[in-house]
Amino acid sequence: MALPTPSDSTLPAEARGRGRRRRLVWTPSQSEALRACFERNPYPGIATRERLAQAIGIPEPRVQIWFQNERSRQLRQHRRESRPWPGRRGPPEGRRKRTAVTGSQTALLLRAFEKDRFPGIAAREELARETGLPESRIQIWFQNRRARHPGQGGRAPAQAGGLCSAAPGGGHPAPSWVAFAHTGAWGTGLPAPHVPCAPGALPQGAFVSQAARAAPALQPSQAAPAEGISQPAPARGDFAYAAPAPPDGALSHPQAPRWPPHPGKSREDRDPQRDGLPGPCAVAQPGPAQAGPQGQGVLAPPTSQGSPWWGWGRGPQVAGAAWEPQAGAAPPPQPAPPDASASARQGQMQGIPAPSQALQEPAPWSALPCGLLLDELLASPEFLQQAQPLLETEAPGELEASEEAASLEAPLSEEEYRALLEEL
């Protein structure tokens, strides 16, 4: 019995149309004899098929194939018409005896199978002469062999490849948690779809490769750059870029945008304390990382488990402390410039104090309340003074005239109020 094999449309290219048997053309008398026998028994035995083959002059294997094809056609037609398949009719007839294949015949067939899994009719007839087996039995043997051992016969299995199957230069592919950020008009970082790679492929500690420049976090240009990271001055002075490195090699969300400086103020009139203050949502963000030793843009996280929270350009901040402006307080001391011929960007950074060396020890991570920072900023006199023109609904001259007229009118007494009510 032959095992089920794939149809001709699913066979490999080397098995289709190469040395196949010629199609047998049936005469009308042969077709009538076959159909009459099929009506009596769709599953004829070997003796019935041999008598029918001798009567119509067709080899018995071709008669067997015809019955198989006719049963398939009838079964499909019954399924389309939702009719039950009658199946076998009458007592089962005798089957063909199992063909015994000796060891020498098996060795010849195996050698031929290793050379070609889909031999043509000429190769099968040659094997039939060498082994003494019928060609139809050799064809069935190859069908069964292909069904039992689909990976044998010199056919190499398909190699599966992926996006991260290989890395340039023999390095590890990027891990699955590496994502890039896209900045909009306000610099809001939007995580891009990450590349599906095997996690843990990169060594721990190096979390951003050369693509770290494409995923920066935003900071105002007035703030000093993070320690160990040199950033060029932007053209318009709106934002500068820095890439903080969180611990354990994990990427963090980019910081939220800061409050932009007032458009009416010049660069020199801006308050360095308020401009250097981190935004309302820039809390619990990792501090700046040290530059990688290779100089290829690889950033390493802090070596300790906990790191202090860094305000951009203001040094490490005390955990849990809120920023409170002090009225009348003297501005912080300005550090001396490192070079007399410094550029304009270094001159703008002189109003920002350098980070204290005593506070650079690692401290546990903490999150500052966003509401306190926002309330303090909204309640500051500078902010109220700047927002006063936006809150006024009348011209200043008209407002002063109405206030002066209201102050000249005396309030009504109780008797005058009652008299007014009676008149109404």
UniProtKB/Swiss-Prot annotation:
The keyword Repeat applies. Belongs to the paired homeobox family. GO terms for molecular function: DNA-binding transcription activator activity, RNA polymerase II-specific; DNA-binding transcription factor activity, RNA polymerase II-specific; RNA polymerase II cis-regulatory region sequence-specific DNA binding; RNA polymerase II transcription regulatory region sequence-specific DNA binding; sequence-specific double-stranded DNA binding; transcription cis-regulatory region binding. Residues 1-24, 72-102, 218-362, 388-414 are annotated as: Disordered. Residues 19-78, 94-153 bind DNA. Residues 278-302, 319-329 have a biased composition (Low complexity). Pfam families: Homeodomain (PF00046). Signal peptide: none annotated. Keywords: Activator, Cytoplasm, Developmental protein, DNA-binding, Homeobox, Nucleus, Repeat, Transcription, Transcription regulation. Residues 265-274 have a biased composition (Basic and acidic residues). One of its GO terms (cellular component) is Golgi apparatus. One of its GO terms (biological process) is negative regulation of cell population proliferation. It comes from the Eukaryota. Residues 1-10 have a biased composition (Polar residues). Changing Q143E: Decreased DNA binding affinity. This is Double homeobox protein 4. Changing R20A: Decreased DNA binding affinity. It is linked to Facioscapulohumeral muscular dystrophy 1: A degenerative muscle disease characterized by slowly progressive weakness of the muscles of the face, upper-arm, and shoulder girdle. The onset of symptoms usually occurs in the first or second decade of life. Affected individuals usually present with impairment of upper extremity elevation. This tends to be followed by facial weakness, primarily involving the orbicularis oris and orbicularis oculi muscles. CDD domains: homeodomain (cd00086). Isoform 1: Does not seem to be expressed in normal muscle, but is detected in muscle of individuals with FSHD, and also in testis (at protein level). Isoform 1: Does not seem to be expressed in normal muscle, but in muscle of individuals with FSHD, where it may be toxic to cells. Isoform 2: Detected in skeletal muscle, fibroblasts and testis from healthy individuals. The two homeobox domains are arranged in a head-to-head orientation when bound to double-stranded DNA, each domain binding to one of the two DNA strands. Together, the homeobox domains can be considered to bind DNA with the consensus sequence 5'-TAATCTAATCA-3', but due to the head-to-head orientation of the DNA-bound domains, the first homeobox domain binds to the consensus sequence 5'-TAAT-3', and the second homeobox domain binds DNA on the opposite strand, with the consensus sequence 5'-TGAT-3'. Both homeobox domains confer nuclear targeting. The C-terminal region is required for efficient activation of transcription from target promoters. It mediates interaction with EP300 and CREBBP.
